[in-house]
Amino acid sequence: MSSHHIVREKQEPALLVLGLDGFDDEQLGQLLEWSPTIITTPITAEKLNVQGIKIDWIITDETDGDLQSDIKHLPVGDKTIIAAAMDHLIEKGYPAVNIVTDEFELAEYLPFADKINLVIFYRQQKIYAVPSGFNKWKPGGEEIRILSSTDQLKTAGLEKSDADVYITSADGFFSLEFNEPFLFISEKL
């Protein structure tokens, strides 16, 4: 059996790289494993180029100074960089995107959470939106943070540690029930 896998375009999550400060090369390697479509900013493009990583799209209104001749330009226009990238990915039919960033503002991602599956890697945290009824197996003693506001959160398998911080009570599944369409949670990498 061949070790080469054929992946159809857009089956795997795209990769939006907004910043690499403090992001582990091994973790980046895992995100690059299936040759995702890579979208980035000019500054981060230089860092990726130095590592020999092929970029598909650069988010910029500037069109000069190509690092690689086959890079496409994604204009920002009057949007934020995040909105320009998300709108592009949704329009192109991507079901999911992994995002590596040095800055995280939940409000920038909320408008897209019901349109594309988001997984955000920020400061040794993995952040993602979950629906009510979500459950996941984790070892005991792991930290789970609730990043979205909710007034009717019911948990199982978690002990409250701080305002929005929970610790898994034992090896096994934890679950979350709430009234909102989704909540953003984070776990440590």
Which sequence ranges carry the predicted segments?
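Acidic/Gly/His-enriched mid-domain segments of enzyme catalytic cores or analogous surface patches
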Residues: D25, G29-Q30, W34, I43-R123
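Short acidic/polar capping segments at secondary-structure boundaries
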Residues: D21-F23, D102-E105, R123-I127, D151-Q152, ...
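Long, charged alpha-helical interface segments
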Residues: Y128-L189
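N-terminal nucleotide-binding beta1-loop-alpha1 segment
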Residues: M1-D21
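Short, surface-exposed beta-edge/turn micro-motifs
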Residues: E12-P13, I55, G141-E143
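A generic local secondary-structure boundary/capping motif
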Residues: H4-I6, M86-D87, E108-L110, N135, ...
